[in-house]
Amino acid sequence: MAATAAVSGVLRRLGWRLLQLRCLPVARCQSPLMPRAFHTAVGFRSSEEQRQQPPHSSQQHSETQGPEFSRPPPRYTDQSGEEEEDYESEEQIQHRILTAALEFVPDHGWTAEAIAEGAQSLGLSSAAASMFGSDGSELILHFVTQCNARLNHVLEEEQKLVQLGQAEKRKTDQFLRDAVETRLRMLIPYIEHWPRALSILLLPQNIPPSLSLLTSMVDDMWHYAGDQSTDFNWYTRRAVLAGIYNTTELVMMQDSSPDFEDTWRFLDNRINDAMNMGHTAKQVKSTGEALVQGLMGAAVTLKNLTGLNQRR
């Protein structure tokens, strides 16, 4: 109970911190006074990302692991200008190991064992797992980073089709609803172990990077939805969407309905509620309360879910 109370206290403060996103560097806003949450504070994104072409409907989005973000190792050139053996930086090796390790998460969870198996699948020694911490946080953050990159790619490709007149622009509420579902479906191959992943992300040392990834994700969703706001609505819209994502994620972990139908029904209701809110002081108040309550609920729910089989 003491641990839950401590985490809850941290989350309560972070709920309001998310409403003050000025502390995060931003890049895509129309106004120089309106920041945009910086992308992927953690993880190892490559310069040549190989991604699958996603279906236009989020309902058809693949539930399997996404394409790897890989790149060939650079060539080392000595002082004479002759190329020597291929050389990979430590960061590149870590990136490849973590990506390979995701294949073994369904069997081993977010553990050093999964990382060791990933290293061995690349022909490396299992001792390479010692490059990472023992709590699995680096593997989890790597996965979240990849999922966010995949979502960004999906939304970017759809925007291009709309601009070319090859697809119809959806209403904001439907666009956001489909974007959240698309992102949550990426968790399905790992849903058995996702409660444990969230409990690790809620550890004090992991909250800053995980919060950064969350704000980056909802910022992408609103950007591609066409949000042009430069006032306080910029913050409230992202805070509300973050709360919707978090609470729907918790429902998903406990959902035993076919294809998570109950989860998507819950998501529909939350999106409708958010779209029906007026731009008033009441909205601002409910925004903060919804986010804090969602994060507080995460702490309590994860306490009950961690280590349990939710799909048996």
Swiss-Prot record:
Entry's family note:
Belongs to the COQ9 family.
- What PANTHER family would the database entry show? UBIQUINONE BIOSYNTHESIS PROTEIN COQ9, MITOCHONDRIAL
Question: Has the keyword Amino-acid biosynthesis been applied to this entry?
Answer: no
Q: Which residues cross the membrane?
A: none
On this chain, the residues bearing Phosphoserine are S80
Q: How does it assemble?
A: Homodimer. Heterodimer; two heterodimers of COQ7:COQ9 come together on the same side of the lipid pseudo-bilayer and form a curved tetramer with a hydrophobic surface suitable for membrane interaction. These two tetramers assemble into a soluble octamer with a pseudo-bilayer of lipids captured within. Interacts with COQ7; this interaction allows ubiquinone (CoQ) isoprene intermediates presentation to COQ7 and facilitates the COQ7-mediated hydroxylase step.
What protein name is recorded for this chain? Answer: Ubiquinone biosynthesis protein COQ9, mitochondrial
